[in-house]
Amino acid sequence: MMYSPICLTQDEFHPFIEALLPHVRAIAYTWFNLQARKRKYFKKHEKRMSKDEERAVKDELLSEKPEIKQKWASRLLAKLRKDIRQEYREDFVLTVTGKKHPCCVLSNPDQKGKIRRIDCLRQADKVWRLDLVMVILFKGIPLESTDGERLMKSPHCTNPALCVQPHHITVSVKELDLFLAYYVQEQDSGQSGSPSHNDPAKNPPGYLEDSFVKSGVFNVSELVRVSRTPITQGTGVNFPIGEIPSQPYYHDMNSGVNLQRSLSSPPSSKRPKTISIDENMEPSPTGDFYPSPNSPAAGSRTWHERDQDMSSPTTMKKPEKPLFSSTSPQDSSPRLSTFPQHHHPGIPGVAHSVISTRTPPPPSPLPFPTQAILPPAPSSYFSHPTIRYPPHLNPQDTLKNYVPSYDPSSPQTSQSWYLG
């Protein structure tokens, strides 16, 4: 799936997100935001939204830019990644993408040992159970935050209390739901002029006309459409739902990362913002480079080693070359490994490139750790807004080449040191 890199900053880009984003349903963004708007309106005005106001909010959310929806989904996926136990993250991705038979995926419990509740929006006071979030995200079922009791776990689930595997979660349908489904079906057939509606035996009784009031602003066809459409639909190249390519990183865990990026929009010049959905949000990897299949270390590193390595702090460094640049055989570097350019039909200039290995930065001459004063190193996908290297300076040179050494025995050095 191709999408613009401007919608995913370095803090929101991770192979976990890269693989799961095409499987998020488009209704998730509209549904979570609509519920939050309704709750905020009720707390402010102490009354519920009118039908016209709610319908206007729904239309506004449905017409939102795809880049905004993807940015929201990437943040939520990053949060879910932290809430899933580390040893189950690989199984979660492989089962959701259909590369492995569904198995239990356990989440980190709350302080009481129960399933956690998270807020799905920034600065939102409405919380959702993790299993509810999974059903809405990957199945597109519009559940309320109070519908936790309607969820049932599969008989194959070994830990129903903490399992968040979407394939193990089902929604219980009661008699009232069946009755309403029949009533709505008869109403739709009557409006469409179906011949069966002319049969008096199949017509709903007249007293049912006044027994139900539709409180939602979605109709049936609209719900079905947005629940089946992936959230990545409408950006870059639109793939049919059944032809969405899977992520090669999770197809073969020993083959490294094949990062697919689109060059339709230029890299962002703004400094990427850190995910701040809530206070306990773990920082995403910054400045880390994903191994290439051509790298000797790629085949020997497991999922857990990559996960731990990408969560470790790094120091500020500047790559020798930009990621997307035409390189000649003379200036090839062992750090940079470029995949064969597989051009997509109709999109010229789209290539796949990753940085193969990560070289440790040179030792700093400063007497104190640089991690305490310097922000995390930005990814090579984006330019840094404050640090600039003059053309005559070599980024690999350390600070000792430009800072005069201090010698207490030398009077000139001592005098210049205090006067400077």
UniProtKB/Swiss-Prot annotation:
Location of the DNA-binding region in this protein = 2-195
Outline the subunit composition. Binds DNA as a homodimer.
Q: Where does the protein principally reside?
A: nucleus
Q: InterPro entries in the record, alphabetically? A: CTF/NFI, CTF/NFI_DNA-bd-dom, CTF/NFI_DNA-bd_CS, CTF/NFI_DNA-bd_N, MAD_homology1_Dwarfin-type
One GO CC annotation: nucleus
Disordered: region residues: 189-208, 252-420
**Start-end of Pro residues biased regions:** 359-368
Provide any one GO MF term from the record: DNA-binding transcription factor activity, RNA polymerase II-specific
Ranges of Polar residues composition bias in the record: 324-340, 407-420
Task: Quote the record's domain comment.
Answer: The 9aaTAD motif is a transactivation domain present in a large number of yeast and animal transcription factors.
Q: Which organism is it from?
A: Bos taurus (Bovine)
Q: Name one GO biological process term.
A: regulation of transcription by RNA polymerase II
Highest rank taxon of the organism: Eukaryota
Subcellular localization, per the record? Nucleus
Record has Secreted as a keyword: no
Matching Pfam families: CTF_NFI, MH1, NfI_DNAbd_pre-N
Q: What does this protein do?
A: Transcriptional activator of GFAP, essential for proper brain development. Recognizes and binds the palindromic sequence 5'-TTGGCNNNNNGCCAA-3' present in viral and cellular promoters and in the origin of replication of adenovirus type 2. These proteins are individually capable of activating transcription and replication.
**The family this protein is said to belong to:** Belongs to the CTF/NF-I family.
Residues with PTM Phosphothreonine: 286
Q: Which residues carry this modification: Phosphoserine?
A: 264, 292, 295, 312, 328, 333
Q: Source gene?
A: NFIB
Locus of motif 9aaTAD = 397-405
Q: What is this protein called?
A: Nuclear factor 1 B-type
Could you tell me the keywords of this UniProt record? Activator, DNA replication, DNA-binding, Methylation, Nucleus, Phosphoprotein, Transcription, Transcription regulation
Q: Locate the Asymmetric dimethylarginine modifications and list their residues.
A: 335, 388
Transmembrane residue ranges: none
